[in-house]
Amino acid sequence: MCGIIGYIGPRKASDVIVEGLKRLEYRGYDSAGIATCYEGKIFIKKGAGKIDELVKKLNFLELPGNIGIGHTRWATHGIPNDTNAHPHTDCTGKIVVVHNGIIENFQELKRELLKRGHVFRSDTDTEVIAHLIEENLRITGNFEDAFRMSLLRLRGSYALVVLFADDPERLYIARKDSPLIIGIGKGEMFMASDIPAFLAYTRRAVFLDDGEYGIVSKDWFTIKDIITGAVKTKEIHEIQWTLEMAEKGGYEHFMLKEIFEQPKAIKDAIYGNVKEAPKVAELLMKYDRIIITGMGTSYHAALVGKYLIQRFGKVPVIVEEASELRYEYEDILDNRSLLIAITQSGETADTVAAMKLAKSKGVEVVGIVNVVGSLATRIADETLYTHAGPEIGVAATKTYTTQLVVLTLLAKELGKLVGIDVSQIEGTIPRLPELVDSSLKINDKIREIAVKLNDKRDFFYIGRGINYPTALEGALKIKEIAYVHAEGLSAGELKHGPLALIEDGIPVVGIAPTGKTFEKMLSNIEEAKARGGFIISLGDDVRLHQVSDIFIRLPKVPEELAPITYIVPLQLLAYHLAVLKGHNPDRPRNLAKSVTVE
């Protein structure tokens, strides 16, 4: 949530910053701004609205200088308006700050600073940081000391980049519970909240850890511990993504591109975990209880993982949303449990907090993560990468299916260790890319279905067993990007209440592959049909055609693999509904790609 970009080097800073902010738009924002420094003077342009509009309206690109910072804001403290947009300055106008996160004690600090004569212009928590640094600079006379003293006073979460007019060849950065990355160029440096912001210039990156601050010039950087001031040694990561992977490549939207990238992403996930999955499976064998956690789509992947691991590993699995686990499981976590944490970005605030809690309780942690070098990968004892590549669309698509692939590989290896026959899924896994590709070939048919359903205001998705999470994920996609009410339900629950909501014309999407619950699903679909439901069924058995208004026939796969192939038409349905309604599926309202604040 929110985006940060900082630059120092030979280029015109405003050009680099505006380009970087555009590449961070997917994180969600309501206002934006940039600041540069030239000949000892700070120049600032900011306002509420979209970046392209602000560039024209406020002439962002006219700002001079080779050092600068930029920000896209998602309002937390203070309404989205020109004044509350970042960057923020102190009383002198010589200290300028951009910040992601929430300063929990900003009211206390603001009262203290008001008593000392500071004048505030905005309602944000961020402005407090600029004034606090100003106050400490008066005391110390030293930029680094003033910066670090201020950090020691802050409670909450932050990724910070600070520019001093009187120290115009260095940027000051810090991180606590919000991502910040240094991009290392040749005679230039970039700071950003996410990799795509600087991918056009460099693929060499350093990830700040929580509790670290740094000083960055165009040729060097130093990272230190906020508490002790000790210098930290940092690993430089070579990012495997290319700039082309983070662009639309001829597709109308990133989401559609990423849906169609799934065959390749799944292939990469399979072959990228050939060696790692067996090793992690052996680790899981040591434990008699496994907990899986995640948020949003990653939580739905966790639910699928529960079915897979219990079915093949014969070990009980608990699944809990990370936001609940960190508060409700504190007294349950112990070294007899293993935690699997699923997070696309590796920076999801609640998931990272749950991982930290587990580690503090002596729990071994396995991460299933897409972004190499992210915080989750540094907390986890073992990491399985999804190898999905950059996902720019806010609604998860290829990162979900690759998470499912990783969980399937892990469960398959567990099955081998406990003596379960896994030959059927083992033989089908290499065919998953072509099976998903066959689901993509019905894109035109799915669009026609979307046209028929475009006036519907309520949807119900139903599934049983391992297909229940697919119902949840399909409903989530409709909610996220088409802004239509949708519920994902366990089909067995229909008679326990939800059936009362089924009436003439309401779409009911039934996920019904051949498997041990198929006959029950067929009965549930017939029940919904008898109450007037408009039935859209997905399956491989022709009997579904007889009870459905629309039958989407998909290739027959082992039931354990159906969540991977069956979600694809539902992603396409949500996409086409969003486009038909005039919404941008890449940037749905009120949502952000990475939820890095709690």
From Swiss-Prot:
Disulfide bonds: none annotated. Keywords: Aminotransferase, Cytoplasm, Glutamine amidotransferase, Repeat, Transferase. Catalyzes the first step in hexosamine metabolism, converting fructose-6P into glucosamine-6P using glutamine as a nitrogen source. It comes from Pyrococcus horikoshii (strain ATCC 700860 / DSM 12428 / JCM 9974 / NBRC 100139 / OT-3). HAMAP family: GlmS. Its main location: cytoplasm. NCBIfam families: glmS, PRK00331.1. GO terms for cellular component: cytoplasm. This is Glutamine--fructose-6-phosphate aminotransferase [isomerizing]. One of its GO terms (molecular function) is glutamine-fructose-6-phosphate transaminase (isomerizing) activity. Its EC number is 2.6.1.16. Residues 2-219 form the Glutamine amidotransferase type-2 domain. It catalyses: D-fructose 6-phosphate + L-glutamine = D-glucosamine 6-phosphate + L-glutamate. Homodimer. It is found in: Cytoplasm. Residues 280-420, 449-588 form the SIS domain. The keyword Transferase applies. The keyword Cytoplasm applies. InterPro entries: GATase_2_dom, GFAT, GFAT_N, GlmS/AgaS_SIS, GlmS/FrlB_SIS, Ntn_hydrolases_N, SIS_dom, SIS_dom_sf. The active site is at 2 (nucleophile), 593 (for fru-6p isomerization activity). One of its GO terms (biological process) is UDP-N-acetylglucosamine metabolic process.
